[in-house]
Each structure stands twice: as C-alpha cells, then as structure tokens.
Amino acid sequence: MIFAAWCACCAISVAAQDCEISLTIAKAAQKEELPSQVQEILGNRLAAAVAGQGSVANSNFTPFFITAKINTLYKETLSGPPVSTALTVQLTLYIGNAVGQKVFSTLTVDAKGVGTNINRAYINAFRAINGNNVKIQEFIREGKEKIISWYNSNYRQILVKAQKSASMHEYDAALYYVTSIPECCVGYEEASKLIDTYYTQYVNYNCQLIMQYARSEWAKSPDAEGASKAFDWLVFIEPGSSCEGEAKALYNEIKQKVTSDWDFENREKYKDEAGLKKQRIEAARAIGVAFGNGQQPVTTNITWLH
C-alpha cells in the first residue's frame, strides 16, 4: 500500500516535469499599492519563472493562479550623486486555486533592490524571482503536482459540466471545459475525444446562424455590395460542416449575378487530414480560451491571501 502510494507520487512528479499547466497571473492585495509598470514587471518575472518549468502563465483566465505579495521591510534614500532608493523586501509567492480559494504552494524570498527611484528599486528587487533558483523551481513543481492531482480527482465533474453546456448549445463553454484538462492528466484522453465532437457541434450550430446572416445580406442588396457582405459571412463556413452545401449553393447563386474574382470553393484551408485535425484542435482551444476570458472576474486581485 505504501509502495503504491509512493509510485503514484513519483508518477505525478514525473508528469509535472513534462506537463504544460496554464496559470493566470493574478494581483495580490499589497500593503503598498504598486504602480502599474512595477506590477507588469512583477508579472513578467513570474511568467518567465513558470515558462522555465515548462508551463505557461499569462492573463488568460484559468482556475489556477500564480501571484506574489510584497512586504517592504526596509526603505532608505541614499545620497548621491545620483540620489537613489534602497529597498529590502519580502516576496511571498503563491500558486493556488482561485475558485476554491486554496493555496497549493508557497515560497518566501528576501530580496534587495537599489534604483534611481522607488519603481526602479522594486524592479531590481524582483530579479530575485529567477527560474534558475532551485527553491523557486521546487515551488513551481509542487504547485504543478497539486494542480495535476486536482485535475485527476475532478476531471469527471469537468466533463459533466461540458456535457451539460453542450446540451444547452453552449458549445464554447463545453470546449472551455474539455480543453482545460492538461495532457498529462488521467482524464485527458477522454476529454480529447470530446474536443472534436463539441467543435463539430459548435461549427454546425453556428453555421446555421452564419447562413442566415449571409442570406439576409444578399436578400437586402442583390448586387455587388450585398454580394461582398454575404461573402464576408460565407468565408466563415468550415469545410465539412453541415452548411457547406448550402454555402456553395448561395455562392453559386451570387456568382451567376455578380462577376468577381472571389474563390470560395477552392480555398485551401487545410492541406491534409493531419493538418485539419491539428487546426480544429487549435481552433477549439482558442474558442475555449475566449469563453474563459469572458468569464474572468472584473478584477484578478486575490484578496483572501494572508
């Protein structure tokens, strides 16, 4: 039993090393409000450290975040020339679940910075957030392991949410859920099979709306201007979608009345089957990311950290 648990722990550890986990760079409530430029540099340092461990941290919304709280321990103005500011700060780094309000990993780093102004002093102090630092590597690894463990335990609920969303024709939400499960997690294979299913449903559902818009533009103005507006909609019809035949029929109808150099039938969107599958997955992920960002709170401040 102990050996099995140890093996499972090792498996998660290895998976964490090879697995890309997406984190949202969040703002923590600070004792002293940081200027936007300083906050941006702090976010960039966090993103670089995470990237060094094979993952991604950016502004895209995910349930999981990385952030840093800053406690200024010492501040002094140094006489020049030039006059400068010296700081000693305590940086406390966190990786956690914003939705569940749970911290997965934390690390405190003491840092010093000197600059020609207070902002430069902070920015120089942030150099302590270095992906080559073994303690920071361990902090990120621990956070990733716990995120993987969370997905392994909760992927069923995620797939249920995806299924429920799809049943209500909320295919962008369904794609958000199924594309959120990392490749290294036990639910990924099951989720990946649903990506193509939900993407096809998304395309077919939306192509009916696209056809309505295209027909409306052509009906309102059956001339070159209306043809141009209709074609602007038709180009969004995916090859292989349930509306492809209708789109070609409308295209041919327009071409009979309006002479132009448009080429709808011969668009080379996909070179081969492998390219099609890859492009569909990328498109599905983009749809999911866009939906997730739409669900993002008005503020990304993490106010519950202590």
Task: Locate each region found by the language model.
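Bacterial Sec-dependent N-terminal signal peptides
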Residues: 1-20
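N-terminal segment of the mature soluble domain
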Residues: 17-69
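Short, well-structured alpha-helical interface segments that form or flank functional binding sites
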Residues: 60-65, 88, 157, 173-176
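C-terminal/domain-edge helix-coil "capping" segments
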Residues: 103, 107-213, 219-229, 239, ...
